[in-house]
Amino acid sequence: MQKVTGDIYNQINNEIYNLEGDKWWRPDFSLNLIKTLYNPFRVGYSIEVFERFKIIPGKTSVLEVGCGGGILSEEIARKGFITTGIDPSELSLKSAASHARESNLVINYEKGTGENLPFEDNSFNVVLCCDVLEHVQDLPKVISEISRVLKIGGIFIYDTFNRTYFSKISAIKILQEWKRWSIMPPKLHVWQMFIKPDEIKSLLHENHLDWKEHRGIKPNISYLKMLRYLRKRAAGKLTYEEFGKKFLMVKSRSTQIMYIGYAVK
């Protein structure tokens, strides 16, 4: 897999993560879905992997690449892990640092990109990268950098979207384009930047990361019921926070839309 061309990368709206004001933690803003809908699944999966490898929180350093407003980083820090978050957006980092202080959490936030991580080799026991890989222009470089900063035996946990017909309909058409159900900003995701499982497996192998598994991600309700909730959210009858609490994301045997996985250095 190669670096995304400029004409495709320029279509994506990454500026949503760089808006004025504390958007990340507001119940009436789309980014709140990370907290209410996706975080419980991501944290639960990560803890399962940690337990599998008998990882001890107080002695384990975790880096979140693309931490945004710190929603996932805070959950990891609450578990007792030594937590660092990195993001290219100064405004997101400002929001993250402010909320961490209010929550009495010690988290090290730094500005930077996944393509050029400002850390020494072999710095972290764990790297997390959730809903980020499909936003970067140079995915091979990001994976290379993640491998570089991971300690030997370290774990890389990630989730992303598969590039399939089903993901195009659900994540692009329904969530972003078709007004009856769309609840996400236009161009939040660009389908051509979605990543097939075999593509990321190949990149992991090239960068000395031993791929272990992929698990699909799906809602724990029927898609018909989810469409009803989407319609209510699109019509303003539910806040993003209320929508995100209507159902859970769970593991699936199908990786056709979203998937999560990990690799070991």
Predicted regions and their residues:
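Conserved alpha-helix/loop element of class I SAM-dependent methyltransferases that forms part
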Residues: T36-G58
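Class I SAM-dependent methyltransferase SAM/SAH-binding core
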Residues: G69-N116
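A short glycine-rich, Lys/Arg-flanked "PGG" loop and its adjoining helix->strand segment in the class I
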Residues: P140-I152
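N-terminal, positively charged/glycine-rich alpha-helical extensions of SAM-dependent methyltransferases
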Residues: M1-D28
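A short acidic, Gly/Pro-enriched loop at the edge of an enzyme's catalytic core
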Residues: E115-V126
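Conserved class I S-adenosyl-L-methionine
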Residues: I155-R180
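A C-terminal cap/extension of S-adenosyl-L-methionine-dependent methyltransferases
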Residues: S103, S202, W211-K265
